[in-house]
């Protein structure tokens, strides 16, 4: 099941390219990349249970096809294997990075559960969750790549910043997808809205509207009355108030910040590939 839905493998690619950008790919780099991919998949499986998600990339999630118990145990099994792969790098900093990922993801999930359904959520609140739940994954993927290539402190800092900004860009694109009408993006459209999550397009729309419609939308969010009719009402409100355009602009801002972090590295195919990864994060169709 996992192998059939392996996805884009962007995360391990970031580990390998980060190592190559500041040195060379080593056997330890491959172990680090495997660890990061396993950890990423474990986090997705656990997220599906927490968020009651039953579809990903156009197919049933593990908890939908089997049970929540099987999903949790599968995620735990992957997490254990991620730790085993991390030990093969023979690097304490890599092990520390893997441990930090687990902590940041858990913090982010709790933060999201606390803030996601609040109509008064701000862009700052939103970015705090995004940094914890998505950007930190990219941050640590790039750090692990650099660590396995013996990168300097300055190189590591640039790689980590690149990963964080690219991760924010990537998540904003995902949140824009929630307003699409195409199931091919890999999850049901309006999935976040139906779960009551207030993401950047809607946050912008609420904060930049002063008429009675704004109060109506906030009341729906706070009451958690997410019927299909109300979800459509909220989606159309965000679109009409320019929420998608604003989110797209912020996404491009973070993409530019990500690419800017690579300016100190000498020109190489690996560096150009990292730039293309950042461009892909904002331009992708799925």
Summary of predicted features, one role per range:
Residues 1-286:
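All-alpha prenyltransferase/terpene-synthase fold signal
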């Amino acid at each position: 099941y996992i192998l059939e839905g392996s996805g884009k493998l962007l995360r391990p690619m970031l580990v390998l390219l980060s190592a190559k950008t500041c040195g060379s790919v080593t056997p330890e780099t491959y172990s680090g990349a495997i660890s990061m991919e396993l950890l990423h998949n474990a986090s997705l499986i656990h997220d599906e249970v927490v968020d009651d998600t039953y579809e990903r990339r156009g197919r049933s999630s593990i908890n939908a096809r089997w049970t929540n118990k099987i999903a949790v145990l599968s995620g735990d099994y992957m997490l254990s294997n991620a730790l085993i792969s991390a030990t093969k790098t023979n690097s304490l900093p890599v092990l520390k990075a893997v441990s930090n990922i687990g902590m940041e993801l858990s913090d982010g999930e709790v933060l999201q559960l606390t803030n996601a359904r609040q109509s008064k959520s701000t862009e700052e609140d939103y970015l705090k969750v995004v940094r914890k739940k998505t950007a930190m994954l990219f941050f640590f993927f790039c750090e692990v790549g650099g660590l396995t290539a013996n990168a300097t402190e300055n190189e590591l800092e640039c790689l980590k910043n690149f990963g964080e900004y690219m991760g924010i860009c990537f998540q904003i694109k995902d949140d824009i997808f929630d307003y699409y009408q195409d199931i091919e993006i890999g999850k049901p459209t309006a999935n976040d809205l139906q779960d009551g999550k207030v993401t950047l397009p809607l946050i912008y729309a609420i904060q930049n509207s002063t008429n009675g419609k704004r109060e109506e939308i906030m009341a729906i969010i706070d009451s958690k009355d997410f019927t299909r009719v109300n979800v459509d009402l909220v989606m159309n409100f965000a679109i009409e108030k320019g929420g998608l355009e604003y989110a797209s602009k912020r996404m491009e801002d973070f993409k530019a910040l990500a690419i800017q972090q690579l300016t100190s590295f000498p020109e190489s195919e690996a560096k150009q590939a990292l730039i293309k990864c950042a461009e892909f994060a904002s331009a992708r169709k799925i």
